[in-house]
UniProtKB/Swiss-Prot annotation:
Gene Ontology MF terms: aminoacyl-tRNA deacylase activity; ATP binding; isoleucine-tRNA ligase activity; tRNA binding; zinc ion binding
Record-given protein name: Isoleucine--tRNA ligase
Function: Catalyzes the attachment of isoleucine to tRNA(Ile). As IleRS can inadvertently accommodate and process structurally similar amino acids such as valine, to avoid such errors it has two additional distinct tRNA(Ile)-dependent editing activities. One activity is designated as 'pretransfer' editing and involves the hydrolysis of activated Val-AMP. The other activity is designated 'posttransfer' editing and involves deacylation of mischarged Val-tRNA(Ile).
Localization per record: Cytoplasm
Keyword Zinc: yes
First-listed, main subcellular location of the protein, grouped into a coarse class: cytoplasm
Amino acid sequence: MDWSQTLNLPKTDFPMRANLAQREPQFLRFWEENDIFKKMLKKNRNNKKFILHDGPPYANGDIHLGHALNKVLKDIVNKYKSLQGYYTPYIPGWDTHGLPIEQQVIKKLGVNRHEVDPVEFRKKCKEFALSYIDIQRQQFKRLGVFGEWEDPYMTLDPKFEARQIRVFGEMAKKGYIYKGLKPVYWCPSCETALAEAEIEYQEDKTYSIYVKFEVIDDKGLFANLNLSGKKVYIVIWTTTTWTLPGNLAIALNTDFDYSLVDVGNEILIVASELVERVMKTNKIDQYHEIARFKGKDLEYVKCKHPFLDRTSLVILGEHVTLEAGTGCVHTAPGHGEEDFEVCERYNIPVIVPVDNKGYLTQEAGKFAGLFYEDSNKEIAKELEASDHLLGVEKITHQYPHCWRCKNPVIFRATEQWFASVKGFREEALKAVDDVKWVPEWGRDRIYNMIADRQDWCISRQRIWGVPIPIFYCKNCRKELITDETIDHIAKIFEKEGSDAWFSKDVKELLPEGTKCPVCGCMEFEKETDIMDVWFDSGSSHAYVLESREDLEWPCDMYLEGNDQYRGWFQSSLLTAVATKGRAPYRIVLTHGFVVDGEGKKMSKSEGNVISPFDIINEFGADILRLWCVSADYTTDMRISKDIIKQLTEIYRKIRNTARFLLGNLYDFNPKTDKVGCENLKEIDKWALQRLYKLIEKVTKAYEEYDYNQVYHLVHNFCVIDMSNLYLDINKDRLYASKSESLDRRSAQTVMYEILVALTKLIAPILSFTAEEIWQNIIFKEEDAESVFLTSWPKVNENILKDETLEEKWNKIIEIKDIVAKQLEIARNEKLIGSSLDSKVKIFAKGNIKRFIEENKDIIQEVLIVSQLEVEEGDSDQIKVEVYKADGLKCERCWKFDTMVGKNEENLNVCPRCYEVVKVK
């Protein structure tokens, strides 16, 4: 007889093979066609808000794994909060101005930006940005990320630009905007100033040189020293030879000792502590010290520039250290921030002998016309020829490069517009402490950055961006910016966008009758610089959070990569504090970078770049989403094909757990078949307790943004509590009991609750799979169209906190583990095949024996053996013996029983199975 026809075997349309790459697009269509995101919002419309403000990715190129990690983490936050009942509108955004897009357009059109019509050029830049917004939008949606994709914010939106102008105006009104000559990062390739956030450091090999500056006025300090007519030189050390034409001073430290060292034919001055190192590096064996002076004694000594007709003044500066070089610092105020500041104190003028394109000017003398990098060799040759070159050393150092063109940048003093961070630094630091930083070290990182940072250079010498809304009087050159001019420009931009600045005449951009407040002239010129793109995105909180009814300022969270401490987190904080006196966010959460399987940075040259779509097209977006939580995302995340393949195995275990649960609930309707808590079998109550503990821990992990913990908890629950234990034990009563028996319905009641809860717990992470499971639950208590329209699972506190139940089942599982080892030995010795082939004898004494006897039936069920006997033992430790089971094997349930075949119809089944088939 085919007994399988009498069993309640699993039935489900939920496939074992996920085929995520093929199946996921169906769920994308389902979510879109049924407006699931909008329905999520509608469901929670009157509840507390949770607003995550999206940091705008740059609209050029396809998304990379860093983008994917970022957007998936945001999606996890939002979906969890929504399931918890929060109202979670999410407005994706794009950063659309700036250098990278300009460069792409120049490359595409093959034009010189200085010769092209600005309005036409800006039009091409806009088209380029919009085309990539469309591409990236589809790519982000493919990840399963929910949001207002058809109504995002863009920094090129006229309303955004108008709000940005008003933010600028508010800062100017408070005195935080000024124009000044200062050294800034300058990219000669891109011909523009750069912000610190636009700088990337790379390891460069270069030459450092030791240069002698002849002392021509010692202030009488050396008069009483017997120098034998030898010349005295102060030795400086530099890694940027090309800046020597800009040298105007030599900085010493007030408190350091400086030695006059006789090296035979001349006297050299270096910091006393560095004498030995400097002499060794420059291969000088014979030397002795003549005298020592404090740095402060040498102040105002004058030296002759080694190749220009100019003097270099000895000055004092706290920035001088003994970490490298000679303790005597080459000082060029046009090429360094500290140089600029220290020279300012001495009223030393600033010269900048390098032009916008990086070529040396007439102020560099015979080196004029050379590209700054090419001048290094020529200057070194000149120094050697004139006997001013003491030595050369090859070094490796971290040097700043342009974030976009990847070429080295220089420090160059130019007239730029700045936001005076000094003006509101204390407020900004206080605002940092009002924010929750996750991880906690983020607080110290941004605090120190703001405490130490200089004023923010906000002007750029480019075309594609929001113009700096300032005018200059043609007569007296006074800058003009007032409430009226800002309001007038903002209103124009709101209607026409910032293109109006380039297409309209000055008179149209100014309120009628505008006069210079100084000289009364009515003729003006426009500022030609645009704003730093970090000012664009840094103003997003003002536009996005305040202009949309369903959002609020400040928002709850910013979530970006940890490079944004010096980028968006900081620019947003600065504009917010300057205009509103507080941070625009309550929580800042950061993640690390994506690196390859060996922990190396991904780069095209290394050939180790993995696209998110390499993974999605082969394994599915849910596997990529699982990867996002598979490690501690607050540090760098490794990825490789091997890592992804390992994750598919973990995913399969979660999926198979869901499939088993679904397959055994095909005939269970919770509305009619549910068993009350008081009537549940004890093993089912234990399983519920395990579920409730899982819900409690997973909820805590989600609340703490510890998604890696969620991943481990869910995986362990599926494998250890479910597959290896509860579900395996349940198979017999699920398949072999009467379909409507209390025994089976008790199991189904709990399995239904486990399935529903598990589906919700994984939904923020495995969104596609959770939706697929939800759609395959035939009968549901919650009549929700989508898993994302349900509520977070709740726990039964009585069961959760039932310590007696927990202690009892901990003992039972301990016994199971001991027995399992002996069963494995018996299996290896070919005594048994399946555990049902066995009879187990447990030898125990005292309380443990009594415990096993009292719970013999439960323990036998848990052990999945045909017979269990308990006998008196002689040790405190239980002893286990395994035998072949007594009786015959039931052909229906495969248990051994001495009563198999002893029934009216002589069927080879056990008494339990006979009762079932007899009825059938």
